A protein has these predicted regions:
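ABC-type ATPase nucleotide-binding domains, specifically the catalytic core motifs of the NBD
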Residues: 5-8, 88-101, 111
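ABC ATPase nucleotide-binding domain signature region
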Residues: 29-33, 38-94
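A short, proline-enriched helix->beta-strand linker immediately N-terminal to the Walker B motif
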Residues: 133, 137-149
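Helix N-cap at the start of a conserved alpha-helix in ABC-type nucleotide-binding domains
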Residues: 157-159
């Protein structure tokens, strides 16, 4: 893909460079992999393309199953809404009915480790660790087939990181 850098004032093209070339990737159910590279090498851009956030200039992306991208702290969360309201909104966007939405919110409550007061507070007041807890809990609440994570779990405490790793291992065992 080509990435465009735009000056905020004039909206004029400052630079154009090719970020990803010759990417050919096939991942099977239950596989887990990491993308390693130097800063600026296109790792995050590749994840945004896989998530459907950025359109490739050429080639195709084929995904089968439900996709849950976690590509930054707070990305996809509405800052004015509470944690629970965000969980309900995400469940609705994923096509959950009323009982599915209730299951999602209960899953978020139990997995995130956030207090009820925290979950009833607007997300804009969350710390980075709280944001990671909420985001990961929402993203994995309905056991997605594909989970894309971009450095989000680098924040927060070691106990929650271990809990996330265990949840990912469980998803892998179930073929997700």
């Amino acid at each position: 893909i080509k990435e465009y850098i735009v000056s905020l004032g004039s909206k004029r093209l400052l630079e154009r460079k090719r970020i990803l070339t010759g990417v050919d990737l096939s991942i099977n159910a239950g596989e887990c992999f990491g993308i390693v590279g130097r800063n600026g090498s296109g790792k995050s851009t590749l994840l945004r393309v896989l998530a459907g956030i950025v359109e490739p200039v050429e080639g195709t992306i084929i995904t089968r199953g439900t996709l849950a991208p976690m590509l930054g702290l707070g990305v996809g969360l509405e800052p004015e809404l509470t944690g629970i309201e965000n969980a309900k909104l995400c469940a609705a966007l994923m096509g959950c009915d009323r009982s599915g939405t209730q299951r999602t919110t209960e899953n978020v409550r139990s997995f995130s480790g956030l207090s009820e007061d925290d979950l009833l507070m607007p997300v804009k007041r969350y710390s980075s660790g709280m944001m990671a807890r909420l985001g990961f809990s929402i993203a994995t609440a309905n056991d997605p087939d594909i989970l894309l994570v971009d450095e989000v779990l680098a924040v927060g405490d070691a106990g929650f990181q271990r809990k996330c790793y265990e949840r990912i291992e469980g998803m892998k065992r179930r073929g997700g």
